[in-house]
Amino acid sequence: MAFLVEKQLFKALFSFFLLVLLFSDTVLSFRKTIDQKKPCKHFSFYFHDILYDGDNVANATSAAIVSPPGLGNFKFGKFVIFDGPITMDKNYLSKPVARAQGFYFYDMKMDFNSWFSYTLVFNSTEHKGTLNIMGADLMMEPTRDLSVVGGTGDFFMARGIATFVTDLFQGAKYFRVKMDIKLYECY
């Protein structure tokens, strides 16, 4: 009798594990594979930032809402809100293809470093929707990678990398960054 119970228990467990194995194989076979070498979408844009200095109200695209507390020479603690144009070329006066809306703050006392969190808002005939980008901008590095963590509209649930290259830096008043955006998950 015990042998019969063990045999039935073995059959039940074997059947259960076989079903789990078949189900997990079915789920995995429908999973989207990601080719990390080839992005599904690729863009190059320029982000322009003109920091408000008290005299440039009409042209300013960003403003410091928290000034640095004086803990060193690297603007540690400075918090900036921005709404800047994104263009296809280096010209600030070119027609914007999007707006970069968000913030950055300086978060390192021993070197220039900032942390960005912003949304690219597209509202053109070519693209509609948003891309959400965030991450550390190690400003002294020649290139920096930030994460594309989502999007809406044409960029629904997009994920990828935004590579920053400082194209122009004019002190505390103006900078231009080339953004090379590669999306690896597109739906």
Swiss-Prot record:
Entry protein name: Dirigent protein 6
Subunit structure: Homodimer.
Gene source species: Arabidopsis thaliana (Mouse-ear cress)
GO cellular component annotations of the record: apoplast
Keywords: Apoplast, Disulfide bond, Glycoprotein, Secreted, Signal
Carbohydrate attachment residues: N59, N123
Tissue: Expressed in roots, cotyledon veins, leaf trichomes, flowers, siliques, and meristems. Present in interfascicular/vascular cambia and developing xylem.
Protein family membership: Belongs to the plant dirigent protein family.
Alphabetical GO biological process terms: (-)-pinoresinol biosynthetic process; regulation of catalytic activity
Disulfide-linked positions: C40-C186
